[in-house]
A protein has these predicted regions:
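Acidic, polar ligand-binding/catalytic clefts
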Residues: 95, 100-171
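C-terminal motif of bacterial Sec signal peptides marking the signal peptidase cleavage site
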Residues: 6-9
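Bacterial signal peptide processing site
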Residues: 11-14
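Extracytoplasmic small-molecule ligand-binding "clamshell" domains
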Residues: 26, 34, 38-127
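Sec-dependent N-terminal signal peptides
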Residues: 1-3
C-alpha cells in the first residue's frame, strides 16, 4: 500500500502538506518532519493492498479542518464537500490504484488511532514523521517543504498587537500557549519553550485560532 502511495506523488516537493502528528511523551523529533502519508500495516502492506484492490475502494482517514490541506467547502455536500491539497492527493491515489476513495472525517487524535488499529487503510491529514510513529506505521516520504529544512519552517501565531512583545519562545513566560492535542507542535512546546504561564490543548487548529483571536490564548 505504501509503495503504491509513494508512486503517486508523496515524494514530490510540489505537493501540498503540513504537519500535525501524534507524538508520545519523551519522543524526540528527527530532522525529517515534513508532511507525508501513513498507511496501516496491521495486516501487512502487501495483504492490505490486495484487500483494497479486491474490494474496490480505499478508506482514508483525515481531519478536514486544516486548510489548505484538507477542509470543507460549504457550497458542496457529502464527500464532495471535502477539498484541499491532501484530498486531491487522496483522489490521485485512488485513480492510480483504480479504486473508489472513501474519506473518513474525524478528529486528529482519532486519525492516527484508526491506522494503528487497522480500522482504515490510509491517513492523509497534514502528518509528519516521528520515530515512534515509524515503529507502528508505514510512512511516505515528506512532500511539503521540498528542499527547505522542515525544522526551520514552523512558527507561532500571535495577535497583531502582540507582534512587538512576542518575538521568540523566550517571550512566553507569562503567556498562555495553545497547541493541538497530539500534534508535533505540542511536542515542540514541551521540548523548546522554556517557560509559559499556562498550556491549553485543543482538539482542532480552528479552536486554537479562535482562542488566540478572543484573547483566551496568546
Amino acid at each position: 500500500l505504501l509503495s503504491a502511495a509513494a508512486l503517486t506523488g508523496c515524494s514530490g516537493s510540489s505537493a501540498m502538506g503540513a504537519t500535525i502528528p501524534q507524538t508520545t511523551s519523551g519522543e524526540t523529533a528527527t530532522p525529517q518532519t515534513d508532511a507525508g502519508i501513513i498507511a496501516s500495516e496491521t495486516t501487512g502492506s502487501n495483504n492490505r493492498l490486495n484487500e483494497i484492490l479486491e474490494r474496490g475502494y480505499i478508506e482514508i482517514a483525515t481531519e478536514p479542518y486544516f486548510a489548505p490541506n484538507e477542509f470543507i467547502d460549504p457550497t458542496k455536500s457529502g464527500e464532495e464537500a471535502y477539498t484541499g491539497s491532501d484530498v486531491e492527493l487522496a483522489k490521485y491515489i485512488g485513480e492510480a490504484l483504480g479504486v473508489e476513495v472513501r474519506l473518513k472525517p474525524m478528529d486528529f487524535t482519532s486519525v492516527l488511532g484508526s491506522i494503528t488499529t487497522g480500522k482504515y487503510d490510509l491517513a492523509i491529514s497534514a502528518l509528519a514523521y516521528t520515530p515512534a510513529r515509524a515503529e507502528t506505521m508505514n510512512l511516505s516520504k515528506g512532500y511539503y517543504f521540498g528542499d527547505e529544512d522542515p525544522q526551520t519552517a514552523y512558527g507561532i501565531l500571535v495577535r497583531k498587537e502582540d507582534v512587538d512583545s512576542i518575538k521568540s519562545f523566550n517571550d512566553l513566560a507569562d503567556k498562555v500557549v495553545v497547541a493541538q492535542n497530539g500534534s508535533l507542535q505540542e511536542q515542540f512546546v514541551q521540548e523548546q519553550i522554556p517557560a509559559y504561564k499556562k498550556y491549553n490543548r485543543v482538539s482542532s487548529t480552528n479552536d486554537g485560532f479562535l482562542m488566540v483571536e478572543t484573547g483566551k490564548g496568546d
